[in-house]
Amino acid sequence: MTNGYIGSYTKKNGKGIYRFELNENQSRIDLLETGFELEASTYLVRNNEVLYGINKEGEQCGVASLKIDDNGELHLLNKCLSSKAGTGCYVSISEDKRYLFEAVYGDGIIRMYELNTHTGEIIRLIQELAHDFPTGTHERQDHPHAHYINQTPDGKYVAVTDLGADRIVTYKFDDNGFEFYKESLFKDSDGTRHIEFHDNGKFAYVVHELSNTVSVAEYNDGKFEELERHLTIPESFDGDTKLAAVRLSHDQQFLYVSNRGHDSIAIFKVLDNGQHLELVTITESGGQFPRDFNIASSDDLLVCAHEQGDSVVTVFERNKETGKITLCDNTRVASEGVCVIF
């Protein structure tokens, strides 16, 4: 049995963090329950037996740490709610487990926290830094919107996507916080959202929410150079849709991207050691607004959370040879679910 967790909004019926048990032998979720009620826990990241989630209480915003016990159940370690500048949308951990990074969409802010490497507890907020870059012309680009922050494969920097400014910004970081290093610009109104790095560290797949495209970019010392780009929806589709999540299969052979509105998952074959993509197919996600999904470590199953409608959680069997996914006759509900991790 594989334990997984789903983060959610708590604006309506969402509970914060859900826990589920994935039965990989039967290709189904045997259990999905409230794991821990945590307000606005819209993104999660795991470090072995510690789970970190975005959190807010009243006007205070920040992150929480939770201990995962032997049964997969969650127990609060501590919280660090040191800001009033908005709730985050993405969290990640540095390779050495000393720092937690957070991106805040609303006000275009990034935060950096110090962690206790022994207990996993959050010690303090080191820095909160606001982006101040020229923005695009799309109506949603009224000001910067940091949407993703994660350490680069070379370990030297963090890369931050800014949906409002159509760019990736890299920063050096240490115990004193962030230091600007380089920026890489994409097309106006792209709405740069997330990055998935190939394991070889040379190539990155940059997804753009507003243009519904994925860029293959060459990564070198904090800089991203676009090599090619692909639509993630059919060219004939003219409805309202926006790109959401991106994941590589663990064998690095296929890339998956979810589309909210078109309600689908686009599947690409990874070619030439990561530097090219080729569309395989676009598959219905089985619900409304597929905000996030993840692939089990076996590479056999894909689990997708849907933010809207009935907030179903769908399970797909995955063909390792073709990359194609097949919807299983097994759905659960995680209200306002927006993040899936194992």
Swiss-Prot record:
Pfam families: Lactonase. GO terms for cellular component: cytosol. Disulfide bonds: none annotated. SUPFAM superfamilies: C-terminal (heme d1) domain of cytochrome cd1-nitrite reductase (SSF51004). Gene3D superfamilies: YVTN repeat-like/Quinoprotein amine dehydrogenase. InterPro entries: Cycloisomerase_2, Haem_d1_sf, Lactonase_7-beta_prop, WD40/YVTN_repeat-like_dom_sf. Belongs to the cycloisomerase 2 family. This is Uncharacterized protein SAB1858c. It comes from Staphylococcus aureus (strain bovine RF122 / ET3-1).
